[in-house]
Regions:
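Active-site core segments that coordinate phosphate-bearing ligands/cofactors
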Residues: 5-17, 23-25, 125, 131-195, ...
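Short acidic capping loops at alpha-helix termini that bridge into adjacent secondary structure
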Residues: 39, 87-91, 115, 227-232, ...
Length: 513
């Protein structure tokens, strides 16, 4: 197969795909990944590096953008070395990224003016409270599909402009650039040649109108962000320029970009309305494809752009859960209750039930469907007989309980029952959690062959753009389910468990009595 890259707005060239691969870059919250994918959607090689996160004050979460970039370039080099597959055999590159995380940098020097403010950061809660009091919530929801919450990028940009010396003046002079992590990577990987984001990442900023598919002037004014700072918005499957030659000698093209959860949706081949996936990563993120319909949630979910490829926008309902895998990290790193994350499944299964103990991991407040930035984490129901296994089991179960709340909210919003749930992410390999999830939801839970569905989705978007794969039907043929978890819990026990969870959540909310 060959393709004339001139049809993609690139220089005229003919590329043969024989013996070639797609490289996917997944820039996550806790690590960055480079993956080489073959024509069957199988992972040939991977390289991963951890990314440091700092917590300068309670509720504040930051990362160094230059370290993130260096780590991403590092794994790009490493995966080529490990596999023996170099840039002359890379047909295209796809990028997926942690969403909402905000970087502002100087247009002249290319240097960030502040650390990246991570999606989990809650420092802008007072700004959000002021906007809610001003009645801005309906404007934001009607234009963006999102709720007013510190989670999204808009208030993070505003905070940087208001709190970094000289930032307001530089922004007014047109000297600053804003981007989510994808934009930061694209700008630097292309040597400053491309300043762009894709529709899915733009839709997570609370500055982008998902109806007009453009930055919204009213929202930019609301958050006091100059339009000159904003990147160009492009299709998720399309041309984002070439990687600079000092990074990859043969300068492969970047042809796919999507926020990590939308990339996961694409990697699961959820191309049709009603298809739903849940990613168990640092947080949990459940998305349902709603096709060309923007479903306005009445149950604490957000509407967002799900897939933006082949000249077509497919929207999605999303429920974002802020603490999932990060809860296991907290048990290990902060409390010393477990020595490794993999130990959690064994400990959780070592006791017959949760012994009436519930863990609400509201370390960064609660996301969907509660949206309470001031909720606080709690463990309740402890007795003298409780052990570390009790707490670990309650922590594992919390992922499934939170996902249950989101899925039921989705069903209420669309008026349909979800018949199965596709899952990915690191915690999807925890058999205890997946079985408990199936038991709570009372539907089959389908475990994919790889936990790296996000990277696969990024690869698919890039490969489609250059003709490496012909169409969506070919991608669907690649999809492989390795295990199905079927529900076994009695209805009586299920309701008993859920009643205890609901009571625990009420205690964690900021308005708890």
């Amino acid at each position: 197969m060959s393709l004339n890259l001139g049809s993609l707005g690139m220089e005229d060239a003919s590329f043969s795909f024989g013996g070639s691969y797609i490289m996917a870059l997944d820039c996550g919250t806790t690590s960055v990944l480079a993956t080489i994918v073959d024509e069957y959607g199988c992972i040939v090689a991977q390289a991963r590096r951890s990314v440091k996160t700092s917590f300068p004050r309670p509720g504040w979460v930051e990362q160094d953008p230059t370290e993130v970039l260096a780590s991403q370039i590092g794994v790009m080099m490493e995966v080529q070395f490990k596999s023996g597959i170099h840039s002359d055999r890379i047909a295209a590159i796809g990028i997926s990224n942690q969403r909402e995380t905000t970087v502002v940098w100087d247009r002249i020097s290319g240097q960030p003016i502040y650390n990246a403010i991570v999606w989990q950061c809650r420092r802008t809660a007072p700004l959000i409270d002021e906007l809610v009091e001003q009645g801005a919530e309906e404007l934001v929801r009607s234009r963006t599909g999102l709720t007013l919450d510190p989670y999204f990028s808009a208030s993070k940009v505003q905070w940087i402009l208001d709190n970094v010396d000289g930032a307001r003046e530089s922004a007014a002079a047109g000297d600053l650039m804003f981007g989510t992590i994808d934009t930061w990577l694209i700008y630097n990987l292309t040597g400053g040649q491309v300043f762009a984001t894709d529709y899915t990442n733009a839709s997570r900023t609370a500055l982008f109108n998902i109806h007009t598919l453009d930055w919204d002037d009213d929202l930019l004014a609301l958050f006091d962000v100059p339009r000159s700072m904003m990147p160009e918005v492009r299709w998720s499957s399309g041309d984002y320029g070439r990687v600079a030659s000092d990074i990859m000698t043969n300068m492969p093209p970047i042809m796919g970009v999507a926020g990590d959860q939308q990339a996961s949706l694409f990697g699961h081949c959820c191309f049709h309305p009603g298809q739903t996936k849940n990613t168990y990563g640092t947080g949990c993120f459940m998305l349902m494809n709603t096709g060309d319909e923007i479903v306005e949630s009445k149950n604490g979910l957000v509407s967002t752009i799900g897939i933006a490829a082949d000249g077509k926008i497919s929207y999605a309902l999303e429920g974002s859960i802020f603490a999932a895998g990060s809860t296991m990290n907290w048990l290990r790193n902060n409390m010393g209750i477990i020595s490794s994350v993999s130990e959690s499944a064994q400990l959780a299964a070592s006791i017959n039930d949760n012994e009436g103990c519930y863990f609400v991991p509201a370390f960064a407040g609660l996301g969907a469907p509660w949206w309470d930035p001031r909720a606080r984490g709690i463990v309740c129901g402890l007795t003298g007989a409780s052990s570390r296994a009790t707490i670990v089991r309650a922590a594992c179960e919390s992922m499934a309980y939170q996902s249950y709340d989101v899925l039921r909210a989705m069903e209420q919003d669309v008026g349909l029952s979800i018949e199965r749930l596709s899952v990915d992410g690191g915690a999807s390999r925890n058999e205890f959690i997946m079985q408990f999830q199936a038991d709570l939801l009372d539907i089959p839970v389908l475990q994919c062959e790889t936990v790296e569905t996000t990277a696969i989705g990024a690869a698919y978007l890039a490969g489609l753009a250059v003709g490496y794969w012909e169409d969506l039907e070919e991608l669907e043929q690649n999809a492989q389910i390795v295990r199905t978890f079927l529900p076994h819990m009695s209805a009586e026990r299920r309701e008993q468990n859920l009643a205890g969870w609901r009571d625990a959540v009420k205690r964690s909310l900021s308005n708890a009595q």
